């Protein structure tokens, strides 16, 4: 326990908040160019080939982003919009590609949860 005099001299320091998505720099989304599109295998109990892309953002930072949904049209030099949100079983993947914007098309034949995958409403 500090003395009163120590508190007068130093004061209490508020705990620093560490952001989960630093490359966004407090923006909701950022635009970037795909430098590499590839698949990655998840951590131990899971098994799959997760689709990921290496993206160079407009602020110059290069990040690994997850491409959600079934099938995608992304390749090198595609312009994408990214948002925060990590993928728990892929180490180092802290961002998601926003489907249905810029060069990324929405998921085809998607009936439920369409807004998350940029899918248009199907004809009745």
Curated annotation (Swiss-Prot):
GO cellular component assignments: small ribosomal subunit
Any Gene Ontology biological process: translation
Keyword RNA-binding part of the UniProt annotation: yes
Protein name per Swiss-Prot or TrEMBL: Small ribosomal subunit protein uS12
Described function: With S4 and S5 plays an important role in translational accuracy.
Modified residues (3-methylthioaspartic acid): 89
Domain of life from the UniProt record: Bacteria
InterPro entries reported in the protein's UniProt record: NA-bd_OB-fold (IPR012340), Ribosomal_uS12 (IPR006032), Ribosomal_uS12_bac (IPR005679)
PROSITE patterns: RIBOSOMAL_S12
Subunit (UniProt): Part of the 30S ribosomal subunit. Contacts proteins S8 and S17. May interact with IF1 in the 30S initiation complex.
Family: Belongs to the universal ribosomal protein uS12 family.
């Amino acid at each position: 326990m500090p003395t009163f005099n120590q508190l007068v001299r130093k004061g209490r320091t508020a705990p620093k908040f560490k952001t989960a998505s630093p490359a966004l720099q407090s923006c909701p989304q950022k635009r970037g160019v795909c430098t590499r599109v590839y698949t990655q295998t998840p951590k131990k109990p899971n098994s799959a080939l997760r689709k990921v892309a290496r993206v160079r953002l407009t602020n110059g930072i290069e990040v690994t982003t997850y491409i959600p949904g079934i099938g995608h049209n992304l390749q090198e030099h595609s312009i994408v919009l990214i948002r925060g949100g990590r993928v728990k079983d892929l180490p180092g993947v802290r961002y998601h590609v926003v489907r249905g914007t810029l060069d990324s098309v929405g998921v085809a034949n998607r009936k439920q949860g369409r807004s998350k995958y940029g899918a248009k409403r199907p004809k009745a």
